[in-house]
């Protein structure tokens, strides 16, 4: 995990922030907000462009987030636009920014206090501001989406991959002056800018340096000068000419064109995966219908009384770590949002990971060294863990301070009820069978009635494999039983979740704890198992030890919840378009030789307008929010908040491509 370097700040005599890394001011000493309006908003003619915009989203990219002043100014202006023109087809603003040296929460707060007109926007940003690692972090401000790509910009830009080609409407070419920050003002930047910009898209920058002008012209931008802000003589503006060609797709086997019509969307599911897909689609104004085969939502794997939320990190896969940390931070942001909307039991009091054997101890210590962030993951001695837990423990282990637990069944049911007030239609006791794509819609029959929707999303766990379109996708079911136990005087002192070869939660308000969970692969039996019930308790006592608080636990009521999780061997979920296995086998079984000979490769053939999110296994509370946001972004053809290498690792055809790209066969 690449640790970020935070900005080193000082303030000059005008109280303007100065970067000690670059020995340059963050914005004009004259007036930072007015400079932002003049250089970037007027330089890109944003107000006029917004009035003439015919798409639902407008995308701005910026080459240095800094103090966030440009973002606050344009977000506030967009809110004014939406209020002035409520019937405009333009509904959403995306602001994509890059930042190598982020400010701290306190630094942002100290600077933003001088701009009371942005108080609400600033408070929302600072509440969620938690730069931890390189890559994209998405923040929500109602109709404004902020994506900050932390880390080295020239390393991040290629990660805005094929799906980002020709998506940016306007650039705020900011950052410190070219003579102070020469590595940013580089040919690579201009090339990526041109690739990412729509035909007719524009840029504006405060500088008029000749090498910047020549660099932008060399890649294809039309460039002109205008009067600079305040005492500055000139600045540059420009656009991507109408005759420009769209960039080629670099990874056609992981690419599929967006759906042309995406207003009417059906989701098959009823658990946490379908919940967050529905949420993100509704936020984009789509008509969404959920089809659930049960009499109530959250009856399957999302129906547990308590579940832990924390990033389950790897010690040997940096990409895995980046993905799960992104998911964890985004999930925390969404939970804060729902805390204000619906009631559900939860407590983010931390999660302890017990080093219950030598192998686990070595793994946890290695993760702690790699993350280098004690706010995220810290190695602790037994005495410190005992303090966090509130009960005695002899093992060393790790502590995740911001993690915790929530009630999945309460959360999912309450959140779905809230989404119904926002337009979600829920159809219960409905089994979708044999859907077929006919005349531009996915259609099926149920009890003699025909159902049809433009888009179909399958978020239905292990039941996914019952569809013919699931051919070749290596999902498998895992039975799990979670035991519910009444508290004891000793056990009720437990303050946070403890994980070992199982887990135990603190007491809920009903006086019960959860111990989980059994793990039986390729088993879909939903009956209570007395053996698994006893095994859950035995794991606690064997891995933690014979303490007063682990003894005297009463299992006699046989209270337990059974669920079937859907999993994959690589322990990474799947999200994206559902691939047509038979066709892709014809397309790519010889891809190793095609690429070696530098032959053309076709775009992947997927089932049209058919998508999935699955394989969340026991990590759904952490991963579902970001997976839902990514899938909704893909469906509506708007920026996806994840790097291209992680996106490729999540796609449903990844397991086949890994083999085909090595020249191996897929049966």
From Swiss-Prot:
GO MF terms, alphabetically ordered: flavin adenine dinucleotide binding; oxidoreductase activity, acting on the CH-NH group of donors; tRNA (5-methylaminomethyl-2-thiouridylate)(34)-methyltransferase activity
Location of the region described as FAD-dependent cmnm(5)s(2)U34 oxidoreductase in the Swiss-Prot/TrEMBL record: 268-667
Catalytic activity field: 5-aminomethyl-2-thiouridine(34) in tRNA + S-adenosyl-L-methionine = 5-methylaminomethyl-2-thiouridine(34) in tRNA + S-adenosyl-L-homocysteine + H(+)
InterPro entries (UniProt xref): FAD-dep_OxRdtase, FAD/NAD-bd_sf, MnmC-like_methylTransf, SAM-dependent_MTases_sf, tRNA_MAMT_biosynth_bifunc_MnmC, tRNA_MNMC2, tRNA_S-uridine_synth_MnmC_C
Signal peptide segment: none
GO biological process per UniProt: methylation; tRNA wobble uridine modification
Pfam families: DAO (PF01266), Methyltransf_30 (PF05430)
Principal cellular location given in the protein's record: cytoplasm
Role this protein plays: Catalyzes the last two steps in the biosynthesis of 5-methylaminomethyl-2-thiouridine (mnm(5)s(2)U) at the wobble position (U34) in tRNA. Catalyzes the FAD-dependent demodification of cmnm(5)s(2)U34 to nm(5)s(2)U34, followed by the transfer of a methyl group from S-adenosyl-L-methionine to nm(5)s(2)U34, to form mnm(5)s(2)U34.
Protein name: tRNA 5-methylaminomethyl-2-thiouridine biosynthesis bifunctional protein MnmC
Organism of this sequence: Haemophilus ducreyi (strain 35000HP / ATCC 700724)
